[in-house]
């Protein structure tokens, strides 16, 4: 039996200055299977041997010519490597709840600056790339505290604001403006004939998401073939 994946693309127009009931969301459902992918491409690369151990990062991100790894549980969680020189430039961001510390950080999808979401404190930090990759403890350019807590998962940039996984029964996601204020619930859980309690619904359709940073969102539900 062929397995199908339902791609749920949500096209949205965001107005963060005045969030009203006029905000609309257009849904388009597409069903595809593996044989629909007609073009195959091979990827090739080269091995870079750095002068320091990479350890076991849970996340990696490229910023210009720098590879930044996130090692949750290490004394300093972000390690910076120069791809051109294969040299480790330094480490930064210690574990903690101080103003320059983080507990459970994750990268936000930006390439013009370094944006990091601390899940434990529901706080978004923004740094300039030169500042973050300097090899010293960076000074953040902005620090945004989300007004709806906690968000125990992914945050993605969308328009002038952010979209995060809610872990609430009302909707799988929350939209926030650039100040961290929640503007609306986003999306709906898949319909099913089985009845769930709120906790069962959240666990049955645990979500993760990604965006193109502009107007398109893809939400995937763990333990299903739904996107």
Feature-to-residue mapping (PLM):
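Asp-box/WD-like beta-propeller blade repeats and closely related beta-sheet repeat scaffolds
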Residues: 120-123, 127-161, 166
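Short loop/turn segments that connect beta-strands within beta-propeller blades
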Residues: 83-85, 129-132, 177-181
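Beta-strand-rich domains and repeat architectures in extracellular enzymes and scaffolds
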Residues: 45-77
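Structural signature of eukaryotic scaffold interfaces centered on beta-propeller domains
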Residues: 56-63, 105-110, 152-158, 201-214
